[in-house]
Amino acid sequence: MASILVLHGPNLNLLGTREPEIYGAETLDDINFRLTETARQAGHHLLTLQSNAEYELIDRIHEAKKEGVDFIIINPAAFTHTSVALRDALLGVGIPFIETHLSNVHAREAFRHHSYFSDVAVGVICGFGSQSYELALQAAFSKITGK
């Protein structure tokens, strides 16, 4: 059984009400429930954290190393374009990760086109709404099992 950590960055706690035309109508609880069930059915353990505070996400990444987490899925949200500290934390623990976004960041404002994570991520999935997380989870399963 593998352990997978899903990290949700700032403002994702507002899913379901924040700009639903961009982010969809599903809540973060809906997404987390579905991911947890999918992981359980595949025989894996899923952990989640949403935070609007960069340091809390960094601390959780550090804890993940101590806990033996096998894989991270992260939607850094607005931190995608600003956080060298989160990038360094992910590199520092050496846990493979997938960068995920609900919207297609490359079809949005120019400042959203740059990511501090994509060049060091196993992969990037964006633009599929909440399905982006499900696709990332399936990719994580494949990487973990080598299939």
Swiss-Prot record:
It catalyses: 3-dehydroquinate = 3-dehydroshikimate + H2O. InterPro entries: DHquinase_II (IPR001874), DHquinase_II_CS (IPR018509), DHquinase_II_sf (IPR036441). It holds the Pfam family DHquinase_II. The active site is at 23 (proton acceptor), 101 (proton donor). It is an enzyme of class 4 (lyase). Catalyzes a trans-dehydration via an enolate intermediate. Homododecamer. PANTHER family: CATABOLIC 3-DEHYDROQUINASE. This is 3-dehydroquinate dehydratase.
